[in-house]
From Swiss-Prot:
PANTHER family: CYANATE HYDRATASE (PTHR34186:SF2). GO terms for biological process: cyanate metabolic process. Keywords: Lyase. The keyword Transit peptide does not apply. The lineage of its organism: Bacteria, Bacillati, Cyanobacteriota, Cyanophyceae, Synechococcales. This is Cyanate hydratase. It comes from Prochlorococcus marinus subsp. pastoris (strain CCMP1986 / NIES-2087 / MED4). GO terms for molecular function: cyanate hydratase activity; DNA binding.
Length: 147
C-alpha cells in the first residue's frame, strides 16, 4: 500500500519531534487512535486542532486545510491486507465476524454498529506470559428500518 504524501509528511515530523500519538492527542484533547486516524486520512480536524498539531510538528500552515477537509474514508486497498498486524484483524473478522454479528443481534435486534458514532481504544495489558493487546470498540447501534 502506498501512503499519501500528507501521511508520510505527518509521520516523518512526528518521528523527528519524538512525539507519540498519545502526546499529540493530549495536546488537542483527542484519543491517540483518533489522532492516528487523522494522520492516515480517515478523520477531520477542526481548524483549532489542525493549527495546534501543525505547530507541535513544526509544519507549514498551508497544511491546515488538508487536515480540516473531510477525507474520502475507508480507502484502503480493496484486497486482503498483507501487513501482518492489519491482517490479524481481517483474520479475526473471518473467524469471529459471524459469531459477533449473531451475539450483537441477539442483544440488540436486526441492525449494525455505527463506525461514525464510534470510538476505539487500544491499551497494553501486562501479562507474565506475554503482554496483551486490549482493543475496545464502542459504536452506536443502528436498527434497520422496516417499511
Amino acid at each position: 500500500m502506498t501512503l499519501p504524501s500528507l501521511t508520510k509528511l505527518l509521520l516523518k515530523a512526528k518521528k523527528e519531534k519524538n512525539l507519540s500519538f498519545e502526546d499529540l492527542g493530549n495536546l488537542i484533547n483527542r484519543d491517540e487512535v483518533w489522532v492516528a486516524s487523522l494522520f492516515y486520512g480517515q478523520a477531520t480536524a477542526s481548524e483549532e486542532e489542525a493549527t495546534s498539531l501543525i505547530a507541535a510538528l513544526d509544519l507549514t500552515s498551508d497544511l491546515k486545510e488538508d487536515l480540516s477537509t473531510p477525507p474520502v474514508k475507508g480507502c484502503l486497498d480493496p484486497v486482503i491486507p498483507t501487513d501482518p498486524l492489519i491482517y490479524r484483524f481481517y483474520e479475526i473478522m473471518q473467524v469471529y465476524g459471524l459469531p459477533m454479528k449473531d451475539v450483537i443481534q441477539e442483544k440488540f435486534g436486526d441492525g449494525i454498529m455505527s463506525a461514525i458514532d464510534f470510538s476505539i481504544e487500544v491499551d497494553k495489558v501486562e501479562d507474565p506470559k506475554g503482554d496483551r493487546v486490549l482493543v475496545k470498540m464502542c459504536g452506536k447501534f443502528l436498527p434497520y428500518k422496516k417499511w
